[in-house]
Amino acid sequence: MSLVLKKSIDDATVRDKKVLIRVDFNVPVKNGKITNDFRIRSALPTIQKVLKEGGSCILMSHLGRPKGARMSDPSPEKGVRGYEEAATLRPVAARISELLGQKVEFAPDCLDAASYASKLKNADVLLLENVRFYAEEGSKKEEERDAMAKVLASYGDVYVSDAFGTAHRDSATMTGIPKVLGAGYAGYLMEKEINYFSRVLNNPPRPLVAIVGGAKVSDKIQLLDNMLGRINYLVIGGAMAYTFQKAQGRKIGISMCEEDKLDLAKSLLKKAQERNVQVFLPVDHVCNKEFKAADSPLVTESVDVPDGYMALDIGPRTIHMYEEVIGRCKSAIWNGPMGVFEMPCYSKGTFAVAKAMGTGTQKNGLMSIIGGGDSASAAELSGEAKNMSHVSTGGGASLELLEGKTLPGVAILTDKDVKERGASCKFAFGVGSPSREACPLRCGHIFGGASIVREIVKIVVALLIGIFIGRRMSTKLIR
């Protein structure tokens, strides 16, 4: 999934240009204060690149899931269409200003910001209000998305996407604007995200372990099915583990279980065996009779959960086993917590996995990738995020990428001019499943693909023939 086939911001001319940057500033806000600015900080390199090169930035983002007004709705007497205080980006504007060390203008209506954009000078920054205040942003109708995109595109000259977190959305700001402008470039964050996922999906250092957790097997079916053909080890935790354990005939007490997915769990375990993937499930558990915090939760001595109890975290023996598995690997990708880590009494398993990955990365060169969402939050809370190779900003996007799906927000970006032998490697941008034929340079051929191997063979044969003829001629001359 290397960006060699998509143009990056380094390929764009931004001097004296107004650069529309789609960022993902969907950050947690409480009482008007941002509680985690990781996504904002992650976008800074792209913003700073434009400012340094003599361009101006027009930042576009969403926050939350506001209801959204229609473009055709009349403007209210006070305020702007679609406005919801809980989803305003004003606090984000203040935080970006602090991080950049300069004033950031704020346009209170993203579709009535032409006057703000026209006043921009080189090295200025403008943040538009939440693009989801308009329903057209995520409309299922292409013509509605395009109508909004045309307005936004009129503000700028160049489009850059740095919003991997929404790359799985076909929206006005992700796919509509680059379509209107006729070009789209990847920002540094987008580039980093795709390059890391490319390595882990196409040609990772081995052994490779996938650590999968969360509540439901049904949420991870496609991920598991797609990854089983790529990994060496599968570590399962979280509530979804108990569907697998019941499928194996284990007692799970009153732990969460998807009864209608038991056959699916059996099928996935069988498929793992057929593909020589070693699966690890919890061997002990931290339990309680209710779904709430406890001063002294029960820690089981066996793999079975007692009647009347629900498992809410993995136990100490399981932690040790999972740490050992991670320790023997060269690559690890993590998607989903091991327990209810939001409650301190059930956080040890999740934090132990985070620590094992962080330590492995720093001391043993482990390539560690956190697949966004709850896993990213857990890595931050544990203090291990800084030690990982990569913590993704995209929960849903990373999940769909791991499932082998197309990411519209990546596919729309402009192709880079490359030689014919690289042009067919579409999976590099999440637009198909990898195959040795379609992606020879990244799918296992040590010489870079069958076509290249054939060319090398031709050259070697020609050299051998030349040597043979040369020797025959030399022999004749000597005689």
Swiss-Prot record:
Which residues are recorded as binding ATP? A215, K220, A239, A311, E342, D374, S375
Q: Which organism is it from?
A: Leishmania major
**Catalysed conversion reaction:** (2R)-3-phosphoglycerate + ATP = (2R)-3-phospho-glyceroyl phosphate + ADP
- What's the protein name? Phosphoglycerate kinase, glycosomal
> One Pfam family for this entry, by name?
PGK
Q: In which pathway does it act?
A: Carbohydrate degradation; glycolysis; pyruvate from D-glyceraldehyde 3-phosphate: step 2/5
Residues annotated as binding Mg(2+) are: A215, D219, D374
* Residues given in the record as CDP binding sites: G214, D219, G238, G336, F341
* PANTHER family given in the database record: PHOSPHOGLYCERATE KINASE, PHOSPHOGLYCERATE KINASE 1, CHLOROPLASTIC-RELATED
In the UniProt record, the gene name given for this protein reads PGKC
